[in-house]
Every structure is written in structure tokens, then in C-alpha cells.
Amino acid sequence: MIISAASDYRAAAQRILPPFLFHYIDGGAYAEHTLRRNVEDLSDVALRQRILRNMSDLSLETTLFNEKLAMPTALAPVGLCGMYARRGEVQAAGAADDKGIPFTLSTVSVCPIEEVAPTIKRPMWFQLYVLRDRGFMRNALERAKAAGCSTLVFTVDMPTPGARYRDAHSGMSGPNAALRRYWQAVTHPQWAWDVGLNGRPHDLGNISAYLGQPTGLEDYIGWLANNFDPSISWKDLEWIRDFWDGPMVIKGILDPEDARDAVRFGADGIVVSNHGGRQLDGVLSSARALPAIADAVKGDITILADSGIRNGLDVVRMIALGADSVLLGRAYLYALATHGKQGVANLLNLIEKEMKVAMTLTGAKTIREISRDSLVQNAEALQTFDALKQNNAA
């Protein structure tokens, strides 16, 4: 199969992966309206073409939390990454490290902190949820600090799991789920050999290390369902801010007032995100939410964005709408499932090339030069953004 875009990796991953795994990353909450709008709204943002600008010395380099990045991207935290390729977190982290961008390890990774961190030169980032088991949270933070993790990404948009109807149909959950997953595994031999047999153990590495016993997929579903904490408030984050002496990023911001609260709290960054459309269906896409948030807090806090980014043009669009950098999630997981570390490396190279084309043809020589001026101001999508900003201000 010829791979020329992230969409090609998605098609390849669908053939390789058992359906319960493919649809787990590909699907969203409820009827998946927000999942679709994430991609559609971002692709509707019209770039402003400029010509004859002497773009010979173009640079994608940027600085984020005092780290030099080869381009304004990082790999997002993705749960169960090690189920998509053999020791998937290690492979993805290696590709990010080689490219000169950060890798973020999920709380619910297959490979534990201690397995991934020693394999890369750049300090990785670590993602954590607010959970009922505060002992686990403290244990995870201590281990992340000991492993040299530089930045804490704190996910706050999961006080309760989203309803993902597709999971019940795919075998991730629902009737006879374990039997259905077994049958899917044996009928997908490439995955069964590479990951099913040779990618063991299939533990939730960070949780197993804390509990002192092996964990599996059923434990993942049950443990998280019992540990998400709907009583979470800003006060619950204070001890974490005191404990963690590195950059702290709040992930899951969609409203300007919440962004202002993050500034008042003392966070170093926010991620404008709807969890990839996997939590509350019907909320704004990240692309629609971002401009008003940027207007509210740009310059007071570092702004990252995710959800819907599928290529380098989307990265440029998000930065033009107000982000300082972006997180890549689904796109890199499709590539990882297809060709492992090399797939992720190739995807990052594709995104880099696409960014260079977009920047060359919009007249932005550096990341700092990408702004609202890089967009067509009277495009339909931007008119919608302006209307939303006016409604938020009213």
C-alpha cells in the first residue's frame, strides 16, 4: 500500500488491527458529532496565500516550556498504546525523540514509566488523571519525577467516562466482549503475532507497578470506571501543583473562563481539547473553541491544542487560530499500528513537509509569524468563530 498521508495510515490500521482496537481509537462519544466536527471545522479554516515573499530561510523550530522543539508538535498521551504495536509506547517515544519533539506517556499505558524513559534522550512528558485513589496519583507522580519526566499533562475532562457506543459493537465492551476480542485477534494474524504474542506483557504498566500484580483489559475498564472522580475541583489540584516542580499543563479546556481559571491557578499551559470527541458529544470542536480562548489568555499562559489534526496544514491552522503548539493523537497511533516506530517517523516527516508547504505559501518564515493574518478573514469558518466570540462576550 502506498502511504502518502495520515489517511492512508488509518486505512492500513483498519486492516491490521482487530476491530475492538481500531474502533476504540477511531470512535467517539454518543453519535460522534463532535468527533466529525473536529476534523471538518479545522479543514474549513481557509489559509491566506501570499506570493513572492523570499521563503528560502524558513524554520519550524520553536521553544516550549524551555525545551527546543524541531517543530511545534508533541505526541499526545494515548491509553493502551502498547496494544497497537509491540511495546508501542517505546516505539512511539523513540520516533518522537529522533524527530526532536516530546512524547507524552499516558497514565494507562501498557509500558510503564520505567520502561520508556531510559530509551530516549529527551525527557518525556507524563499525563495524569484526577482519580479517587490519591495514593496511586502520588505514586505515579513520584515515579515520573524519578524518571526525569519534564512536564506534567493533567487531564481534567474525564470526571466520568464518556459513553462510546461504538465500543459495545466492536467488542471492547458489551455482551461476550472477551470472546469476541479473542476471535478478532486470531483472525488478524499480523497483529496477533506482533502484539498478541510478542508484545507481552499486556499489563497496564503504571497501574500494575502500583498494585503489585498483573492487570489486563478488564482491569483497565473496571479500575478506571471505579476511580474517575466527579467531585474534582480546582482545589483538588493544589497539592499536585505544590508537589510537581516542573511545567504543569491542564488538558481539556474548551471555555475562555476555564482558561482564565487555569491562569489564576498557576498552570504553565493548557490544552484546548474535547478529548478527541470521546467525552461529551455536542461540545465545540477545538478549532471553534480556540480563537476565543486565545483572545482571553494568549500571553498569560502557553496554549496547546488537539483534536482533529490530521496533517501539517492542520497544525498551521491551529497555530494561526491561537495555539503555540499542538498535540498529535489518532494520527500517530494509526501510523504506529501500521509500521511501528518507522510509521510514526514517516508520519512526522510528512507533517513537517506539509507544514513547510503551508508556511511557504502563506508567507510565514517562522512559527511566530503564523497568526490570524495567515487566514482568510472573511471565510465562512472565521465568520462562525467571530459569531461565537460575540456570543461568549454577551
UniProtKB/Swiss-Prot annotation:
Q: Mind listing the GO molecular function terms for this protein?
A: FMN binding; L-lactate dehydrogenase activity
Q: List localization entries.
A: Cell inner membrane
Catalytic activity reads: (S)-lactate + A = pyruvate + AH2
Residues at which FMN binds: 106, 127, 155, 251, 306-330
List the Pfam families: FMN_dh
Alphabetical keyword list: Cell inner membrane, Cell membrane, Flavoprotein, FMN, Membrane, Oxidoreductase
Q: Which residues form the FMN hydroxy acid dehydrogenase domain?
A: 1-380
Q: Which organism is it from?
A: Klebsiella pneumoniae (strain 342)
Q: Which residues form the active site?
A: H275
Family indicated by similarity: Belongs to the FMN-dependent alpha-hydroxy acid dehydrogenase family.
Recorded topology in the membrane: Peripheral membrane protein
Q: Which GO terms describe its biological process?
A: aerobic respiration; lactate metabolic process
Q: Name one GO cellular component term.
A: plasma membrane
Binding-site positions, substrate: Y24, Y129, R164, R278
Lineage, please?
Bacteria, Pseudomonadati, Pseudomonadota, Gammaproteobacteria, Enterobacterales
- Sorted alphabetically, which InterPro entries does this protein's record hold? Aldolase_TIM, Alpha-hydoxy_acid_DH_FMN, FMN-dep_DH, FMN_HAD, FMN_hydac_DH_AS, LldD
Q: Which cofactors does the annotated protein need, by name?
A: FMN
List its EC numbers.
Answer: 1.1.-.-
Function according to Swiss-Prot or TrEMBL: Catalyzes the conversion of L-lactate to pyruvate. Is coupled to the respiratory chain.
Name of the protein in its database record: L-lactate dehydrogenase
Gene from which this protein is expressed: lldD
